[in-house]
Curated annotation (Swiss-Prot):
In-chain residues carrying the UniProt-annotated modification N-acetylserine: S2
Catalytic residues in the record: H11 (tele-phosphohistidine intermediate), E89 (proton donor/acceptor)
Keyword Transmembrane: no
Job description of the protein: Plays a major role in regulating hemoglobin oxygen affinity by controlling the levels of its allosteric effector 2,3-bisphosphoglycerate (2,3-BPG). Also exhibits mutase (EC 5.4.2.11) activity.
Gene: BPGM
Name listed for the protein in its UniProt record: Bisphosphoglycerate mutase
Amino acid sequence: MSKYKLIMLRHGEGAWNKENRFCSWVDQKLNSEGMEEARNCGKQLKALNFEFDLVFTSVLNRSIHTAWLILEELGQEWVPVESSWRLNERHYGALIGLNREKMALNHGEEQVRIWRRSYNVTPPPIEESHPYYHEIYSDRRYRVCDVPLDQLPRSESLKDVLERLLPYWNERIAPEVLRGKTVLISAHGNSSRALLKHLEGISDEDIINITLPTGVPILLELDENLRAVGPHQFLGDQEAIQAAIKKVEDQGKVKRAEK
């Protein structure tokens, strides 16, 4: 039986989402479409009469800005927002900045799908020579984390994401949900997938089939042990949501010329 409700989402679209590049820990901002997605998400939640007590985000701009726009649409700008690197997008290592379609051409669609969606495959780590290495690791936000800078990831599998996310869920977010607080988590595709895996008990093999579109609110109903009592629900126009999911899935494919 459902006792608690949790809303989570992947942030709105950013420039690198549109350019089909691995964004990861590079601090790309929302583009105009992403801002509109966030506002529409807020409108959807307002229509359903959601009143939030607390919002959790990553430390990346696109996650935080999405939360702000949602709260603005709700008229709930005063609601506290807490940010943690543990909700960051998966660290894609050496793949950061690369175009997914070009990667599919060079390595095959299945390999790119495994890098993007599998549970325990880790891409090659980022090196100091990588064009975005210093932009990431010289950023002040990573000097105030709960782990030393040299212990932050250089590449992650989805399993790694779940392992660094779970302490934050268990120690910070879950207690608020258990107190009856209505919580919004504005995160990323893979940190959201990792949390869904944990709460819904999705298998290591099946998680590869879970794809999340940008800017769509996800409702999870949880029991007294904070386990999902059913599958997650995308809130909104279901036909449009399925089209958005397909768009994300197609990012790792080679475009075929029409005959």
